[in-house]
Amino acid sequence: MFLKRGAAVSKNKYDCFLHFKGYLFPFELKSTKNKSVSFSEKIIKPQQIKHLKEAAQYPNIIPGFLFQFREPENKVYFVHINDFLTYKNIAENQLSHTYKNKINKSSIPISICEEIGTEVRLMKKKVNYTYYLNKLCDDLIKKEQQSVSAV
């Protein structure tokens, strides 16, 4: 496969990352007007999954996707890479599961993001939104610490 001349090729492993209270948060950002985000390689690229999965191997790193569902009302959810991979495997292979909501074998719907993810609180301003990422990071650190202490 050859790229067209002048085609942009990302050299970054993540769309963005935050550092907060000694933790690193690598994020892949996905936005849609639909009620689900497709697993299509055009939308979620294999190297994005690979890099997030690799990051999950290290302490104090909480990697995942930020899924923005713009319509009918703007909602954003963080889904940890491990939770995403578990869901994707169950959905694509039609395995038995304990999800309360219906699964879709080719995408992750907003209802599953609500169930397995953490909502990013936001406030609508005149034109744009303000996202409360400090609150999100605090919530994710607490979840991480609880899962580590449970083991």
Question: What residues fall within each predicted segment?
Answer:
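Helix N-cap / beta->alpha transition motif
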Residues: 45, 77-85, 109, 132
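Active-site metal-binding core of divalent-cation-utilizing nuclease and nuclease-like domains
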Residues: 1-22
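Short, surface-exposed, polar/charged, turn-prone segments marking secondary-structure boundaries
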Residues: 29, 53-57, 92-97
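Mg2+/Mn2+-dependent nuclease catalytic core
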Residues: 32-51, 58
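Nucleic-acid nuclease catalytic cores
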Residues: 53-86
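Short, electropositive alpha-helical surface patch
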Residues: 77-104
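Charged phosphate-binding loop/patch that engages nucleotide di/tri-phosphates or the phosphate backbone
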Residues: 106-151
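Conserved catalytic cores of phosphodiester-cleaving nucleases, focusing on short active-site segments
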Residues: 16-18, 23-34
